[in-house]
Amino acid sequence: MGTHPSVPSKNIASGETLRDLVTTHPELLGPAVSGAFGAGELPFLFKVLSIRKALSIQAHPDKALGAQLHAADPKNYPDDNHKPEMAIAVTAFEGFCGFRPLEQISALLESVPEFKEIIGDAEAKAFETAVAGQEHAAEGSPEDKANRKALQALFSKLMNASANRVEDTARRLVERAASQSETFAAGFAYFDELAEDNGVRRGTDLAHLITRLNTQFPNDIGLFCGGLLLNYVRLYPGEAMFLRAKDPHAYISGDIIECMAASDNVVRAGFTPKFKDVDNLVSMLTYSYNPVLEQKMKPLPFPRAHATNGSAEFILYDPPIAEFAVLEGKLEPTATAAVEGLAGPSILITTEGAGKISTQGTEITLHAGSVIFIAPGTPVDIEASERLVTYRAFVEVSPETKL
């Protein structure tokens, strides 16, 4: 949902694209948004993803790199923008997000022979020696920079392994994970901060994950760069995480609401038959190894929306970027709510239930799958005929904002 030229939204009645509509009627964006992000363009893309098969391990460029990649290779990088993303779980969600803590990577190099083999004994030892005793270095310190350099060297070695080497080593990794799951990565364990049960995860859990992913992408390099190098993440309904530019991630399963800056630039690493730009991938990543809990978002109250009858709740997911935020609304049957006009354009989707939305004499019926564009400064009233759940992506900037 949005104005991106790859797949612009369309007015159901007229067939006119939203891109053409906001170009013809710039007041639908408003001067502040047009001034900050350019005319004729919503600064965000809004998506619903239902993930049955893992999506590619990937990262997205920042603004400077996005411009460089687009200029050099417009076929694979169709625009010049960055693409930070936010994912909100509608159902239980699994994914990968950012590199594991360094001590976990060292432990896996020692406990998973195929991992050390594909990296190489000398390179694995060089990594373990470089990070030993400074795994929790202060961000930006000389030790932290050395850690990131060591992690980059390790990742580069993996991503540049030959296809035959990956195929053979991954096959043996999967065979051992399947036949020796109870002893896989013996001694490896970590406390899962994002798990609902606050449980300890062990090598057995990793073995089951690897064998499951292998049924989707047999003997793929993603089994190493995702399963062993990246944090495994679980989100439960209502939880969200923010995915920064230049950090690797992947979606494994679940239903999510996703919002991102308006870009289609993707640099892929694994679990994909598509183009993998290994050189740019290796050079662009931040190699941050911060706890994944830092990327989990805390929903905020939204005082500009409130129930006028019955039970209604609104919470805001507000990432640390200017392009977008998402407002979740939940209304119980027969409840009504009022939402003040927002200072920028927005798109609302209904994911559950039925009801109606109205403003200044105009009324539209809502049902699961309804998508509504709402102009800046438009107050709306929402009424639920049955339990109603909506998500509304929007942008608000001050007139002086320049990006």
What are these regions (language model features)?
Residues 241, 257, 372, 380:
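Conserved beta-strand position immediately N-terminal to the Walker
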Residues 1-239, 249-354, 359-364, 368, ...:
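Active-site region of the double-stranded beta-helix
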Residues 401-403:
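C-terminal helix/juxtamembrane-tail motif
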Residues 238, 380-387:
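Noncatalytic modules at the cell exterior or secretory-pathway interfaces
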Residues 371-378, 388-391:
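C-terminal interaction modules of eukaryotic adaptor/scaffold proteins
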